């Protein structure tokens, strides 16, 4: 799976809980009273209108063909974000069971096939209504991981050199540090995912569109799996927006995120930061940073809604 910045082990004691309060993850949404809310609502409405118009403008036969293209495109760009440059031709060959004799290239082809397969399952309503649930998030990870070669299910402890196997669909039992972010302790992960599900799985369509960016970041912030969190977050976001916007699977945000990768990652890091004083919301994390990421995310969706080529 290999997120581009490999998850780093911070402690080998498995399953411990530091007792973190779920309040340290707040806010989970940009508040109604935020000075940013008006502009974000306008972007969400614009996205909904343009997505619906684009979907209605195409006959079903074109929608089906375009959905196949988007799955390959989404896979290609999601791979780029992970640091895996799998050529579109190799992705197409993988879908035809035509694999390279080069072991590394073959592994990346299998990874690409896994991504396309899981997204097709989402497009066929396999995750309908469950994208932001603990069950759904674990199922994305499980379905993806079970299709990967063993080599891509291994992460290395930078302190001991130990090669640790990632168990598909299983929440991590170890501490991890990604960049400067120490994720919540492994014993706290179910508690934080419970709060995540409580907030994001019960939203109406309009609220889902407006909150998809926040869900994307907060899942990465929790970092529920030993590896593969970036892919799961992008597939979850794809599924949430597909349900809320009835996209027909004909556009995806992954291309836009990959083309602005540096900004995407800067925005995610900014959302990790604590509140910047009394005018920055009422939660532990910066509401202004979350609002800025939401703006970036929605604008990226608007630009990405009409894919024509890789």
Residue ranges and their predicted role:
Residues 1-310:
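FIC/Doc superfamily catalytic core
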């Amino acid at each position: 799976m290999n997120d581009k910045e490999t998850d780093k082990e911070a402690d080998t004691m498995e399953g411990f809980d530091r007792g973190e309060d779920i309040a340290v993850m707040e806010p989970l949404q940009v508040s109604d009273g935020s000075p940013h809310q008006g502009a974000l609502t306008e972007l969400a409405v614009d996205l909904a209108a343009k997505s619906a118009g684009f979907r209605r403008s195409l006959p079903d036969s074109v929608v089906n063909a375009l959905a196949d293209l988007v799955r390959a495109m989404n896979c290609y760009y999601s791979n780029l974000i992970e640091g895996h440059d799998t050529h579109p031709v190799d992705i197409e060959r993988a879908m035809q069971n035509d694999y390279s004799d080069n072991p590394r290239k073959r592994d990346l082809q299998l990874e690409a096939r896994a991504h396309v397969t899981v997204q097709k399952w989402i497009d066929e309503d396999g995750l309908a209504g469950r994208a932001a649930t603990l069950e759904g998030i674990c199922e994305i990870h499980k379905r993806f991981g079970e299709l990967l070669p063993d080599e891509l299910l291994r992460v290395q402890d930078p302190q001991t050199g130990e090669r640790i196997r990632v168990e598909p669909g299983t929440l991590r039992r170890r501490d991890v540090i990604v960049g400067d972010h120490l994720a919540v302790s492994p014993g706290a992960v179910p508690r934080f995912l419970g709060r995540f599900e409580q907030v994001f799985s019960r939203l109406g369509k309009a609220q889902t569109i407006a909150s998809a960016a926040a869900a994307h970041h907060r899942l990465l912030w929790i970092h529920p799996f030993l590896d593969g969190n970036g892919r799961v977050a992008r597939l979850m976001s794809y599924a949430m927006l597909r349900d809320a916007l009835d996209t027909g699977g004909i556009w995806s945000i992954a291309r836009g995120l990959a083309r602005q990768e540096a900004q995407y990652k800067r925005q995610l890091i900014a959302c990790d930061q604590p509140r910047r004083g009394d005018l920055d919301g009422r939660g532990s994390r910066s509401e202004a940073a979350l609002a800025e990421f939401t703006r970036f995310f929605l604008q990226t969706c608007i630009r990405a809604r009409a894919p024509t080529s890789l």
